[in-house]
Amino acid sequence: MVLIPTVAVVVVVALVAGLVRFTNWRAQVRAAEAAQLELTRTYDFNPGNIISDGQFFNGSAMSQAEVQSFLDTQGGSLAAMTFDTSNESGEGLCADYTGTKGESAAAIIDQSARACKVSQKVLLTVMQKEQHLVTAVDPSDYQLMAAMGLNCPDTADCDPAYAGFFRQVYGAAKRYRYYLEHEEQYGYTAHNLNYIQYHPNAACGGAQVYIENKATALLYIYTPYQPNIAALAAGNGTGDSCSSYGNRNFALIYTCLLYTSDAADDSLR
């Protein structure tokens, strides 16, 4: 009788266990992808691919003049507003920002986008999602102070280091780059299964989502909930007590206001 060496047995067992885990993982991925496909067909919303990398990380998606024209057409007060900006370090994530007095909102949006290689359309979408700034007439001080919702928790004041329109816009663009460089530090990763809640109340449940790209992972790091069926069925309206709307509204605003055919490029820029 020939005895198989113990080491060989251990290796075989490990290989079999690994194969079983991979097979189970692939089955879960296929189930998540099937559910996401059904949501896309029914509600035109894919929780695993809210926006492509090519759309999100295109710092040349619009020119400053195009940003200004877009703001003008929306009828909000932001189109005519100016802000004093300051010198800010890009901290190796973005190009440094050179401040000046009386800089237009369009210039701040465009320069922040180019400095951090984040789409102007994304920045416009986020400020509309967070504070309705694109369309707001006579926005409040708080709307401007918390323009992008950056470091502005629901239960406390905004961090003074990020308060104000300029610091919110440039800071948010830089934060997205930080997330991109340090994705592994957060709970949501691309090309992987991620359990994403429907609401801050864990009792509302959630679902596994196969996140298809880095841009979508960043949106979940920034706003860590997915819309439930009630939120999706409501369109741009109100769902139920377990609904959240941040990422649904991002998709709706981006698609309705800012989507153009340049989205075909799905590369990281």
Language model segments and positions:
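Catalytic and binding regions of secreted/periplasmic enzymes and modules that target cell-wall glycans
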Residues: L123-L258
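Hydrophobic membrane-insertion alpha-helices, especially the h-region
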Residues: L3-G18
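Extracytoplasmic/secreted envelope proteins and their assembly/folding machinery
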Residues: Q64, Q68, A106-D110, Q120-L124, ...
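Short secondary-structure junctions and interdomain/linker hinges
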Residues: Q74-M81, Y179, E183, S261
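N-terminal export signals and maturation junctions of secreted/periplasmic proteins
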Residues: A17-A107
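Second-shell loop/turn segments in exported
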Residues: E91-K101, I108-A115, P153-Y162
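Conserved small/polar residues in nucleotide/adenosyl-binding loops
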Residues: Y259-D266
